[in-house]
């Protein structure tokens, strides 16, 4: 503590040189315990470079601040109210000592005055735990720069300090400022309220203007950091020159203002956020009026959000919509009358225990200025006033607890700063229906309000239009705003218009808010919660049209009974089944006749039975595929059809052998007959077909699969094979080979006896099958949609009909209509005729 005390002692010389008598009872009220008050009754923004370190500026030479006097009156009112309250600090008189700090120009001298004892001396001690300064606590000052200056002194002595409007986040550092508390929400809450306001009205293209002091720079940086995490962009940021209203601007400063307003005119952004003390804005808004910059939305920081002097520039009503962020309004009963009460008309002050005081305790024009703005102040509600009011009450309640006043009497004793500070941290009471307590950072939970400037005679000049609650971090109670636009439409401030649903953003330039809107392609969608700059592909079972924000399920396509192609194929299959069944009955009844035996005898019944089974399998092609239906499609149906084709091929070969090869190769023919050559051949072909079927099923499986229709991606084709076309080629290969073999042997037997000459019928059946299969393969090579399944089934049924009617039909015709040709004698005569022709 010794180095710090030495520093205080050296500065204390300044205090003793500059002390002078007090002149006005506004600033002093004697009491058992004094509160120090620091208020800006006059303001000067520029540094006082002409003063040396022994000089303190005379605040009365600067511009009067009506708001500052209003806040000082709030402290006086609170102290008077507490002194008249028998339940709070009974028999204890609370006093005050208040000083005008000229905004930032006069802070060190008042704080030294408060720290000194009644003899204006600050003794150097090793331990200040038992030191009693002039005041027990300090209320103020109002801005962050001044608060930090004062807090650096007061924190050395743990003298409680409660600021009512400083919002800098640096003040939350309790290691650096252990004795500092505040009754105003921190800067990050003010910034968040602005951001939520902009998000609510979809303003993502803004301009930021800041003052050149710490307040402007810090808050501008906080806003920039917050916007870096969101979708709001800063078109540009400019620093306003520090110009006081009663000072002449330099040519450079004037040109700077002209340039800034010109830039505002040229920008497409129509929302302007301004972080600046009110005094620097007077000349700026005069330049805005001169250049007639209209149509903007001005968002005011708390430093000028409810400033009556700027509001008095009534021509601003034509410049756009003014919105401000400020502390909630809490009406204080009786304060409106007290604010304009002449202090000389009140009760005379008690004799001071000391005739010494400090300078800057006068404001001759404050009362008159307050009277001129009283209507505005009254209608606007008590906002920052309540922060001063609650700060005084917080100290009073802490002092009440420290003095043990809970039983109706107080024990008056010396109060050490650290003792009172400890009690202030613990206060928790209700004041005008609002809870007063401090969080670990020393902040009090007050919500913020968004106010709109209005200029109607009967209107609230600062009408509340929304509330911001820091704990929930959201706007509530949003009311209609009177926009200064055509038809009262909400102003638009966007670098780019919002993309429609299903459009991605293509960045243009360096700002994420500037972009082009590109439609998402079919099959993709835009998930805005994940990425607004890239369209995502739909899942494999879903699809989307162009410019969609979501995908829809693809329609599953398979043959259905209500479709016309399915009905046609079903009718053909029914016709084939009935005709084949009729042929089977006819052949059964005429089994012993030469016509049936020449057609193959028992082999015919095998073929007809397999044809019936094949017709019965046709319904498995209709409806959604299952494992069982896929098995029938891939195994049972191909096997039946292949055996039928093999029977025809073997039968053709057998007839040729009987009439042409038996005489030339008698030994081979004898083996063919002895070892049942036809059935062995058919068994071999059947086994070969079964092997190919098993290989195909092992390669592809039996579980139904889906594939996208290449002609209509909204459709997903359900099939039994992931590679339906290649599988069909593989299964058809052996059948095509057998058809070629059957056709070849039938052609070789074209000169055989008429009753055994089946070349025409086999040629018809095999040629039809070969042609239809080749056509199907050609169709499938060019088209891979759902029609492939329909064409495959149609061709299959037609091939079955070709065998049923083309091969067996003529024989039934002969049996039924030419029975005289179905006799052994007729067949023998035909064989004899063939033999005679050969000879």
Curated annotation (Swiss-Prot):
<keyword id="KW-0807">Transducer</keyword>
<feature type="glycosylation site" description="N-linked (GlcNAc...) asparagine">
    <location>
        <position position="428"/>
    </location>
</feature>
<dbReference type="InterPro" id="IPR038550">
    <property type="entry name" value="GPCR_3_9-Cys_sf"/>
</dbReference>
<dbReference type="Pfam" id="PF07562">
    <property type="entry name" value="NCD3G"/>
</dbReference>
<keyword id="KW-0472">Membrane</keyword>
<keyword id="KW-0732">Signal</keyword>
<feature type="transmembrane region" description="Helical; Name=5">
    <location>
        <begin position="728"/>
        <end position="748"/>
    </location>
</feature>
<comment type="function">
    <text>Putative taste receptor. TAS1R2/TAS1R3 recognizes diverse natural and synthetic sweeteners.</text>
</comment>
<comment type="similarity">
    <text>Belongs to the G-protein coupled receptor 3 family. TAS1R subfamily.</text>
</comment>
<feature type="topological domain" description="Cytoplasmic">
    <location>
        <begin position="749"/>
        <end position="760"/>
    </location>
</feature>
<feature type="topological domain" description="Extracellular">
    <location>
        <begin position="624"/>
        <end position="635"/>
    </location>
</feature>
<keyword id="KW-1133">Transmembrane helix</keyword>
<feature type="glycosylation site" description="N-linked (GlcNAc...) asparagine">
    <location>
        <position position="312"/>
    </location>
</feature>
<feature type="glycosylation site" description="N-linked (GlcNAc...) asparagine">
    <location>
        <position position="127"/>
    </location>
</feature>
<feature type="glycosylation site" description="N-linked (GlcNAc...) asparagine">
    <location>
        <position position="368"/>
    </location>
</feature>
<feature type="glycosylation site" description="N-linked (GlcNAc...) asparagine">
    <location>
        <position position="487"/>
    </location>
</feature>
<keyword id="KW-0325">Glycoprotein</keyword>
<protein>
    <recommendedName>
        <fullName>Taste receptor type 1 member 2</fullName>
    </recommendedName>
</protein>
<dbReference type="InterPro" id="IPR001828">
    <property type="entry name" value="ANF_lig-bd_rcpt"/>
</dbReference>
<keyword id="KW-0716">Sensory transduction</keyword>
<feature type="topological domain" description="Extracellular">
    <location>
        <begin position="20"/>
        <end position="566"/>
    </location>
</feature>
<feature type="transmembrane region" description="Helical; Name=7">
    <location>
        <begin position="785"/>
        <end position="805"/>
    </location>
</feature>
<feature type="signal peptide">
    <location>
        <begin position="1"/>
        <end position="19"/>
    </location>
</feature>
<dbReference type="InterPro" id="IPR000068">
    <property type="entry name" value="GPCR_3_Ca_sens_rcpt-rel"/>
</dbReference>
<dbReference type="InterPro" id="IPR000337">
    <property type="entry name" value="GPCR_3"/>
</dbReference>
<dbReference type="InterPro" id="IPR011500">
    <property type="entry name" value="GPCR_3_9-Cys_dom"/>
</dbReference>
<dbReference type="Pfam" id="PF01094">
    <property type="entry name" value="ANF_receptor"/>
</dbReference>
<dbReference type="GO" id="GO:0005886">
    <property type="term" value="C:plasma membrane"/>
</dbReference>
<feature type="glycosylation site" description="N-linked (GlcNAc...) asparagine">
    <location>
        <position position="292"/>
    </location>
</feature>
<dbReference type="InterPro" id="IPR017979">
    <property type="entry name" value="GPCR_3_CS"/>
</dbReference>
<feature type="glycosylation site" description="N-linked (GlcNAc...) asparagine">
    <location>
        <position position="84"/>
    </location>
</feature>
<dbReference type="GO" id="GO:0004930">
    <property type="term" value="F:G protein-coupled receptor activity"/>
</dbReference>
<feature type="transmembrane region" description="Helical; Name=2">
    <location>
        <begin position="603"/>
        <end position="623"/>
    </location>
</feature>
<keyword id="KW-0675">Receptor</keyword>
<comment type="subunit">
    <text>Forms heterodimers with TAS1R3.</text>
</comment>
<keyword id="KW-0812">Transmembrane</keyword>
<feature type="topological domain" description="Extracellular">
    <location>
        <begin position="703"/>
        <end position="727"/>
    </location>
</feature>
<dbReference type="Pfam" id="PF00003">
    <property type="entry name" value="7tm_3"/>
</dbReference>
<dbReference type="GO" id="GO:0050909">
    <property type="term" value="P:sensory perception of taste"/>
</dbReference>
<feature type="transmembrane region" description="Helical; Name=3">
    <location>
        <begin position="636"/>
        <end position="656"/>
    </location>
</feature>
<keyword id="KW-0919">Taste</keyword>
<feature type="topological domain" description="Cytoplasmic">
    <location>
        <begin position="657"/>
        <end position="681"/>
    </location>
</feature>
């Amino acid at each position: 503590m010794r180095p710090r005390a030495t520093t205080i002692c050296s500065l204390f010389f300044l205090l003793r040189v500059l002390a002078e008598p007090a002149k006005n009872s506004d600033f002093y009220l004697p009491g058992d315990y004094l509160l120090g008050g620091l208020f800006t009754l006059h303001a000067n923004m520029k540094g006082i470079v002409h003063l040396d370190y022994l000089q303190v500026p005379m605040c009365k030479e600067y511009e009067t601040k009506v708001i500052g006097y209003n806040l000082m009156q709030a402290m006086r009112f609170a102290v008077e109210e507490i002194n008249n309250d028998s339940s709070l600090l009974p028999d204890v008189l609370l006093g005050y000592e208040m000083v005008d700090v000229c905004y930032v120009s006069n802070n060190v001298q008042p704080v030294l005055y408060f720290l000194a004892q009644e003899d204006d001396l600050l003794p150097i001690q090793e331990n200040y735990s038992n030191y009693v300064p002039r005041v027990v606590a300090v209320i103020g000052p109002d801005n962050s720069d001044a608060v930090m200056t004062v807090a650096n002194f007061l924190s050395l002595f743990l003298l409680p300090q409660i600021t009512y409007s400083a919002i800098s986040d640096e003040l939350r550092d309790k290691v650096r400022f252990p004795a500092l508390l505040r009754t105003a929400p921190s800067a990050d809450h003010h910034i968040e309220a602005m951001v939520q306001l902009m998000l609510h009205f979809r303003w993502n293209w803004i301009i930021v203007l800041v003052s050149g002091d710490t307040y402007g720079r810090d808050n501008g940086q906080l806003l920039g950091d917050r916007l870096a995490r969101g979708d709001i962009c800063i078109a540009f940021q400019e620093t306003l020159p520090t110009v006081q209203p009663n000072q002449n601007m330099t040519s450079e400063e004037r040109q700077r203002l002209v340039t800034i307003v010109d830039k505002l005119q040229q920008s497409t952004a129509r929302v302007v956020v301004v972080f600046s003390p009110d005094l620097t804005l007077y000349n700026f808004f005069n330049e805005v009026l001169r250049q007639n910059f209209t149509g903007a939305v001005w968002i005011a920081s708390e430093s000028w959000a409810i400033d009556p002097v700027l509001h008095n520039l009534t021509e601003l009503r034509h410049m756009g919509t003014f919105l401000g962020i400020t502390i909630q309004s809490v009406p204080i009963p009786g304060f409106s009358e007290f604010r304009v009460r002449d202090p000389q008309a009140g009760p005379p002050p008690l004799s001071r225990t000391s005739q010494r005081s400090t300078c800057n305790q006068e404001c001759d024009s404050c009362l008159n200025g307050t009277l001129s703005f009283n209507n505005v102040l009254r209608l606007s509600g008590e906002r920052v006033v309540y922060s001063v009011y609650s700060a005084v009450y917080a100290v009073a309640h802490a002092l009440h607890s420290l003095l043990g006043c809970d039983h109706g009497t107080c024990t008056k004793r010396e109060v050490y700063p650290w003792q009172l500070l400890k009690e202030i941290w613990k206060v928790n009471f209700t004041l005008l229906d609002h809870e007063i307590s401090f969080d670990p950072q020393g902040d009090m939970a007050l919500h913020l309000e968004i106010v709109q400037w209005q200029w109607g005679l009967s209107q609230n000049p600062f009408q509340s239009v929304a509330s911001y609650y820091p704990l929930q971090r959201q706007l509530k109670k949003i009311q209609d705003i009177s926009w200064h636009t055509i038809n009262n439409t909400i102003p638009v401030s966007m670098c780019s218009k919002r993309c429609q649903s299903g459009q991605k953003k293509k960045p243009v330039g360096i700002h994420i808010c500037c972009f082009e809107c590109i439609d998402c392609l079919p099959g993709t969608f835009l998930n805005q919660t994940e990425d607004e700059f890239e369209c995502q592909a739909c899942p494999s079972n879903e699809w989307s049209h162009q410019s969609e924000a979501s995908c829809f399920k693809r329609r599953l396509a398979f043959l259905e009974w209500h479709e016309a192609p399915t009905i046609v194929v079903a009718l053909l299959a029914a016709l084939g089944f009935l005709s084949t069944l009729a042929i089977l009955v006819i052949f059964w009844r005429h089994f012993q006749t030469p016509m049936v035996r020449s057609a193959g005898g028992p082999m015919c019944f095998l073929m007809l039975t397999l044809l019936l089974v094949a017709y019965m399998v046709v319904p498995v092609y209709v409806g959604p595929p299952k494992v069982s239906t896929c098995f029938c499609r891939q195994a049972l149906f191909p096997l039946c059809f292949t055996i039928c084709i093999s029977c025809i091929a073997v039968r053709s070969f057998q007839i040729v052998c009987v009439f042409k090869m038996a005489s030339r190769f008698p030994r081979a023919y004898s083996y063919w007959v002895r070892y049942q050559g036809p059935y062995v051949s058919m068994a071999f072909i059947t086994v070969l077909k079964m092997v190919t079927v098993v290989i195909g099923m092992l390669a592809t499986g039996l579980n139904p699969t889906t594939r996208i229709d290449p002609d209509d991606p909204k459709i997903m084709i359900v099939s039994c094979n992931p590679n339906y076309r290649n599988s069909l080629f593989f299964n058809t290969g052996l059948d095509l080979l057998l058809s070629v073999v059957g056709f070849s042997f039938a052609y070789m037997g074209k000169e055989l006896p008429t009753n055994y000459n089946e070349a025409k019928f086999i040629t018809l059946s095999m040629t039809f099958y070969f042609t239809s299969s080749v056509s199907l393969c050609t169709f499938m090579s060019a088209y891979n949609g759902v029609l492939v399944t329909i064409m495959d089934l149609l061709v299959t049924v037609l091939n079955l009909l070709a065998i049923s009617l083309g091969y067996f039909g003529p024989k039934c015709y002969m049996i039924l209509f030419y029975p005289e040709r179905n006799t052994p004698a007729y067949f023998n005569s035909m064989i004899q005729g063939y033999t005679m022709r050969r000879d």
